[in-house]
Amino acid sequence: MQSADSQNTPKRPRRDGSPRTPPDSPLADAETSPSHDLDPDYRTWGPEQVWSFLRRCGFSDSELLKRCREKRMSGSLLPFPEDLGISSHGKKMKLLNCIQDTMKVINDPIHGHIEFHPLLMRIIDTPQFQRLRYIKQLGGGYYVFPGASHNRFEHSLGVGYLAGRLVRELSEKQPELQISERDILCVQIAGLCHDLGHGPFSHMFDGRFIPLARPEIKWTHEQGSVMMFEHLINSNGLQDVMKYYGLIPEEDILFIKEQITGPPESPIKDASKWLYKGRPKEKSFLYEIVANKRNGIDVDKWDYFARDCHHLGIQNSFDYKRFLKFARVCEVDNMKHICTREKEVGNLYDMFHTRNCLHRRAYQHKVGNIIDTMITDAFLKADDHIEITGSAGRKYHISTAIDDMEAFTKLTDNIFLEILYSTDPNLNDARMILKKIESRNLYKFVGETQPMIQRIKKENYEHLPNEVASAKPSDVELEAELKAEDLIVDVINMDYGMEDKNPIDHVRFYCKSDLSKAVMITRNQVSQFLPETFAEQLIRVYCKKTDEKTLFAARQHFVHWCLINDFTKPQIKKLPLRKLKKELTTATG
C-alpha cells in the first residue's frame, strides 16, 4: 500500500510531447490552457477562454490580451468593452458583433459536437458551399453500399474541423512556432474549401468524364476548388468580412489557395527552393495539414477514413486522435515538417494499409466503377443538349461549366435526374443508359487481370478496347462479332498514395530522448511483414451488350488477349466450374 506522501509525489515528467509533457510556457499550462471548444454561453468563460476568444476575433493588441490575463477578466465582462479597456468605438462594435457571432456548434456523427468560427460560418452559408450537399462523396458507390449516402458537404466540415484541431495542437504544444490566429483561420478555411471544385458524383467527374469530354485539357477538382473559392469570396463580398476578423486578403487568400493546389509550377526542380508565397519558409509545416504533398498524411484522409468507413460499414483501424497527441514540428533539411514519435511508425503503415483496403473494397468496387462508367457514358451523350446558364447569361454544357463558376455552382448530382426525367428526344440515348442503372441492367463484368512485368501507360488506355476486340482466338467458333465499342477496359492503379513509392520514406520521426531531432526509419527497421511493392495495376473488362453469345465471345477475346500480353491468369466472372475450364482449355489449345 502506498503512503500518503508517496501518493502526493509528482510523477516523473514525460518528454515525448504528449499531453503530460510539462508546459514550456504559461500558454501550455494545463490549468490555464484555453480549451479547443468554447462553451456557447460566454458568461461561463474564465480568463483564458476570454483571452482565446479575443484572439480568435482578431484582437491582436498585446496590451489588451495581457490586461485580460493579469486582471483575470471573466466572460461576464464581455458586453462591457470599457471594463476591458476598449475605448475605440470601432473596436467596441467589433467586440459586440463577435459576441453575437460566437462559435457555432454542429453535431457531426463522426466527430461529435464541433465548433466553427463565425467567418467559417459565413463561408458555409453561401450557395457555392451549400452546393456540396448535392454531390455524393462516393459517386456510384452509393448504388453498391446503401449506407454511403453522405455528401461532400459533411466531409468538408469534418476536414475544416480537423485542420483546426491539428494546427491548434501544434500551436499550444510549441509556442515557439509563432502560429498566429490568422494562420489558424486560414488553415481551417483551406480544409473547409478544399473540395469546392468537385463535380457531379465526385471523382467520376474529373477522373472519367472530363478526360473523355475534353481530352485537350488537364483539369482537376483542386483547380476547380481554387476557382470556386475565388468566386465564393467575390460574389458574397467576403473580403471585408475577412478583414473584419483579422485576415489580410491580399496575402491570406493566396495562402489558402496554395494549401489546396500545392506550389506553383517551376521549371527548375530544386527541392531547397521555397516556391510558396502565402507564408514564409519558416512556416512550411502549415502546408502539410490539409493536403500533404510530401507524404500524404493529412486531415483530409483522416476525415474520409472515419466518415467513409462509418457509412460503408467497414472497420476503420486508424485513430487520428493518437497522431494528434504525438505530432510535433521538427527541422528537416532547413525546412520545418510535421513529425511523430518513432513508435508510431507501425500505426502509419496501418493508415496507408487502410487507404489501400478502402480502395479495394469500396472505391474500386467493380460494380461501383461500372456504374460510374455508365453515368459517364450518359453524360457524354447528353453533353451537347444540356444548357446551364452562367455569368452574363451565357450558356454552358456539362463539360464546359468548369470554365464559369456561376454555371458550375448549378452543376450537381441533380443533373442525373434532370436527364432521367427529361422528355427531350435529344436525350433519349442518355436517358436509356440511366434507366438501365435504375433497373440494375448494368454492363456485364467480363474479367480481371494484371500486367506481370510492365504496367500499361496512361496514353495507351484508349487503345485497349481495340486490342481486346482484335484478340480473336482462331481455334474457337464464335457466334457473335465483338466490336471495340462493345467493350469497356478499366485500368485501376492501386497504391499507398505515392505511386510505387513507400510513403513512410518521406515521413520523419522524433525520439523521446530528443524532441527536436528528426530521424528516418527504414522499412527493414519496422517489420519483415510489410509489403515488398507499394503499387499494382488491375485491368477489368466489361461488355455493354448483355446477351449470352456476345458475353461468351467477350470472355474468349479477353482470355486470348491476356495470353498474348503475358498477363496474369484472367479471373473470369462467375461461371460454372466445368464451363470455365472448358473455355480456358479451348482458348489455350
From Swiss-Prot:
Broad class of the protein's primary localization: nucleus
Subcellular location field: Nucleus; Chromosome
BP terms from Gene Ontology: dATP catabolic process; defense response to virus; deoxyribonucleotide catabolic process; dGTP catabolic process; DNA damage response; DNA strand resection involved in replication fork processing; double-strand break repair via homologous recombination; innate immune response
Active site: H221
Binding-site list for dATP: Q137, R152, H198, H203, K301, Y304, D308, R355, Q364
Catalysed conversion reaction: a 2'-deoxyribonucleoside 5'-triphosphate + H2O = a 2'-deoxyribonucleoside + triphosphate + H(+); dATP + H2O = 2'-deoxyadenosine + triphosphate + H(+); dCTP + H2O = 2'-deoxycytidine + triphosphate + H(+); dGTP + H2O = 2'-deoxyguanosine + triphosphate + H(+)
Region (Disordered): 1-41
Cited function: Protein that acts both as a host restriction factor involved in defense response to virus and as a regulator of DNA end resection at stalled replication forks. Has deoxynucleoside triphosphate (dNTPase) activity, which is required to restrict infection by viruses: dNTPase activity reduces cellular dNTP levels to levels too low for retroviral reverse transcription to occur, blocking early-stage virus replication in dendritic and other myeloid cells. Likewise, suppresses LINE-1 retrotransposon activity.
Name of the protein: Deoxynucleoside triphosphate triphosphohydrolase SAMHD1
Gene designation per UniProt: SAMHD1
